Amino acid sequence: MGRLGAARTWIGARSSLPREVYVLGLVAFCVAVGFGVLVPVLPVFARSFGVGNTEVGAVISAFALMRLISSPFCGWLIKIFSERIIMATGIFIVAISSGLAGISRSYLQLLALRGVGGIGSAMFTVSAFTLLLTSVEAGVRGRAAGFFQAGFLIGGITGPAVGGVLAAISLTAPFFFYAGTLVVAGTVGLVLLRRRSAEPTETAESVVSFRAVVSDARYQAACVTNLAQGWTSFGVRSSLVPVLVVELLHRPASWTGIAFACAAVVQTIAVGPAGRFTDTVGRRPAMILGGTVAAVSIMAVPFAPNIWLLIVVLCLYGVASAFLGTAPAAAVGDVAGSRSGTAVAVFSMCSDIGAIIGPLVAGLLADTLSYAAAFGAGAVLMLVAAALSWRMPRDQRLSPKNGRSRGGPSKGEMHESTATE
C-alpha cells in the first residue's frame, strides 16, 4: 500500500501541472535511483584502497564541498546557456565522473572524480529547480515542488534495493549503473524539455534584483529553513540515528535502513497533500507547521524507548520534511520571479552548508555532551526557521487554475505589494 500510495501521489494533479514538471520528476527519479544504488557501496569501495575512515569521509565530503563551491556560478551559467543545457551538461558530468570512478586505480583518482561529480551535481540541482519554479504559475508551485521531491524520494527508496543486488556482483557495478541512469536522465531532459522561450512564463512578474530578493522576509525564511533541513537531515538524522539504533536501542544496523525506508515512504505519500496545502492555504503556515513539527519530532528521537517509537517519530519527521521540501521552494519562486538562477543557487547552498557543518557539530555535541544535546541543536535551528517564517507576510490564497488570488490582486500586483511589506 505504501508504494502504491507513493506512486499515486507522484502522478497526481495531472490537469494542473505543465509537461516540464513531469519531465523533471522523471529526471529526478532516474538520478535518485542511481544515487541510491551508489551510496551504500561508496565507503566500502574507498576502503578497498587501504585508507582509513577519515579518507573515506573525505570522499563523501568532496562531493558536497564542490557542490557548495560551484553553486554560485550556476546562476550565471544559466543566464548564458539556459536551464535545459546546464542541467543536461551537469548530469553528463556526473555520469562520466561516476563511470570513471568505478575504474579508479588509486584513492586520489577516486577523490578527484567525486569532486568533479559535485560540480556537475550543483549544475543539475540549480538549473532543474530554476526551470521547475519558472515553468509553473504561482498557484501550483507547491505541487510542482512536491512532484519533483517525490521523484527523488521514490528513486531513493528504489535505489538501495537495486544496489544490494549489484553490490553482490561487484563493488564497481553500482558506479556503472549510476552512470547509466544519469545518461538516461540527461537524454530525457534534452529531448523532452522545450527550449527556453524568449519571454518568461510569468510575464506579469518583473525581473527582481538579487539584492531585493535577499532583503525579502520570505526568501530569508526559506534559506534558513533549507539550512536547518540540511543540518537536521544530514547532520543529525543520517549521522547519529544509525549509531543510536545500535548503541542505545541495541538493535542490528539493518533496523536503521528499515526505519529510514518507512520514513521515506511516509514522506513520499505526504508530499502531495503538502503541496496542495502550500498552494491553497499558503507558504507561511506550511513553513511554520513544518518547522515546528520537525523540531518536536527530531528532539524526540534520542528519547524514544524502543525501535517502534523511533520509527513513528522518524515518520512524523518525514511528514514535516514534505512541507519543508515544498513551501520554501515555492516561496523562493514567488520572491525571485522568472529567471531566478542566482536566488535558487544561494537557496541550494544553504542546504549544502547545513549538510557539511551539521555532521561535525552534531558529532562533537554527541561526544562531549549527549545525544539529546546533538538532536536539540537541530531542533533549535528548526524553531529559528519557524520563527523567521512567522515574519513572512500573510499569503494571498491562490487559484491553482490561473495563479490569481481569490478576491485579491493579480500575481504581479501581489508580488509588488508583498515585497514592500
Where are these regions (language model features)?
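Helix-loop-helix hairpin linking two adjacent transmembrane segments in secondary transporters
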Residues: 148-190
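Conserved MFS/SLC helix-loop-helix module at the cytosolic interface between two early adjacent transmembrane helices
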Residues: 69-105, 278-284
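Residue-level signature of mid-helix packing/kink "hotspots" within the transmembrane helices
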Residues: 64-72, 156-157, 264-272, 355-356
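Helix-breaking motifs and short loop linkers at transmembrane-helix boundaries and internal kinks
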Residues: 50, 82, 103-108, 250, ...
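C-terminal membrane-cytosol helix-exit motif in multi-pass small-molecule transporters
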Residues: 180-199, 385-393
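Cytoplasmic helix-loop-helix junction between adjacent transmembrane helices
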Residues: 113-152
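Short amphipathic helix-loop junctions that connect adjacent transmembrane helices
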Residues: 41-53, 239-254
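Juxtamembrane intracellular "pre-TM" segments in multi-pass secondary transporters
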Residues: 2-18, 195-223, 408-416
